[in-house]
């Protein structure tokens, strides 16, 4: 997978105009309890108008080391308004029943600084509204560390399986597809080309031709 492809997706993600706080998309309306924050909640509408990566996480999964890549992604692009939201879940039987242990894994073991919620159901009929909304626009998680790239207008630009790492170029390209910033998402994340210059005349046709192909490959990964 080329870095150019990932960069193109991220660039297009950046093109969406910022959304006013008053224009909170339906999917982002509501709040979720913040992990080990003594009653503090995360207002999802704060993400309106920003590129967002939503990930369902688990503390005892083979993909748990992806926390490191997600944090690196967040640190690299947070100055460009990228947000990452981690939602722990025991839907796949790999999360602790003790949120203190969940917090230790992400905050202490992996140094996570992006927002994390208390464990939530993310699939099936019991999924929280946020994940129902994500699934309606894409598909529901089939395993832990399923990644959704959401643009500034609350639209899912792309989704990536657990196999896609946070530094994957295609994930970063998807982030650009929803925001004008040019470098953001994981799928098998790799660093964006240093020049950061990608013409729309190149990116738009490229994505138009390859999006269907990529979707098919992503489904096959599952």
From Swiss-Prot:
Class in the EC hierarchy, top level: oxidoreductase
Catalytic residues identified in the record: 61
GO BP annotation list: cellular response to oxidative stress
Catalytic activity: 2 glutathione + H2O2 = glutathione disulfide + 2 H2O
Leader sequence segment: 1-22
EC number in record: 1.11.1.9
Record's protein name: Glutathione peroxidase
